[in-house]
């Protein structure tokens, strides 16, 4: 059974009163690709082995738990955060193939795209890594390449998307009200999820090391994509408050999380201590 955790870094940013953990595998660390609105469509998936790999990769990403049960430790799938099969602008996979390898501060190394995928399996899926040279990883990366058709290779610029959230202070009581009014109908009153929406806290959700466990990352995702039936209707403060409320609940721990950001300077909304920032 997963260990539930409510890690807190003492003395950090006021919003992190008891924040625990979209993986999600979110894209907080990546620049927005210019081609996000023009993802390649089904009509141009070719016949033959390449097209078969594209379709299988998409199937693995949209039915991750059913397709790869040995590697998924919760009730999420990759497209729980990367909506519209990875085509939605906030969380898009369009262009991601062209941005790797890239240096990422969380690991402190230059990551390949296979490493990044496996990081999501460990964190957002609370599971285990795929064989980086195996057929499952090959087909997932092939789908990314297909979506990135026509996107030029360029260095990944540091993202500025999360900077605006630095000015916000969370009110988790207000977040609870937003959750009850706008989120519980899909995600459950206790965050347990429903048949059509993933759990957002508890043993079956993403773990404390997932990108979505960061309040700023979650607020950015929520502000663009939620509620699912009326995206973009929440005010920024409401998105921030509900992100803090969701992440104030227990969720699975991540072994080795203290080794994140090995060169220091973790983002201020990381809810757990690291070896370089206790």
Cite the ranges covered by each PLM segment.
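Post-signal peptide N-terminal segment of mature Sec-exported envelope proteins
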Residues: 32-52
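Flexible coil segments in periplasmic/lumen-exposed cytochrome c-class electron-transfer proteins
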Residues: 26-38, 75, 100-101, 107, ...
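C-terminal motif of bacterial Sec signal peptides marking the signal peptidase cleavage site
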Residues: 21-24
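Gly/Gly-Pro-rich "capping" loops immediately C-terminal to redox-active cysteine motifs
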Residues: 42-43, 69-118, 192-227
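Sequence/structural segment immediately N-terminal to covalent heme-attachment motifs in c-type
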Residues: 49-85, 166-197, 215-217
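Sec/Tat-exported extracytoplasmic proteins
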Residues: 61-68, 82-85, 121-128, 144-151, ...
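N-terminal secretory signal peptides that target proteins for export/translocation
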Residues: 1-9
């Amino acid at each position: 059974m997963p260990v539930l955790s409510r890690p807190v870094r003492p003395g950090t940013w006021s919003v992190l009163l008891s924040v625990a953990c979209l993986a999600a595998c979110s894209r907080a660390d990546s620049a927005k690709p210019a081609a996000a609105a023009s993802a390649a469509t089904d009509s141009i998936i070719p016949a033959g082995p390449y097209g078969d790999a594209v379709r299988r990769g998409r199937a693995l990403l949209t039915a991750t738990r059913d397709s790869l049960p040995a590697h998924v430790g919760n009730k999420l799938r990759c497209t729980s955060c990367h909506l519209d099969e990875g085509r939605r602008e906030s969380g898009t996979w369009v262009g991601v193939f062209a941005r790797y390898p890239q240096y990422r501060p969380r690991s402190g190394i230059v990551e390949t795209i296979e490493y990044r995928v496996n990081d999501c399996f460990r964190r957002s899926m609370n599971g285990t890594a795929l064989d980086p040279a195996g057929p499952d990883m090959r087909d997932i990366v092939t789908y990314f390449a297909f979506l990135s058709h026509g996107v030029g290779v360029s260095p990944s610029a540091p993202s500025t998307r999360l900077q605006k959230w630095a000015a916000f202070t969370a009110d988790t009581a207000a977040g609870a009200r937003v959750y009850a009014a706008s989120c519980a109908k899909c995600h459950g009153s206790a965050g347990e999820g429903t048949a059509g929406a993933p759990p957002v806290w508890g043993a079956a959700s993403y773990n404390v090391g997932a990108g979505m466990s960061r309040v700023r990352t979650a607020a950015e995702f929520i502000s663009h994509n939620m509620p699912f039936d009326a995206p973009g209707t929440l005010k920024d403060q409401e998105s921030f408050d509900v992100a803090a409320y969701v992440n104030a609940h227990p969720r699975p721990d991540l072994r080795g999380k203290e080794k994140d950001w090995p060169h220091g300077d973790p983002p201020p909304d990381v809810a757990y201590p690291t070896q370089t920032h206790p």
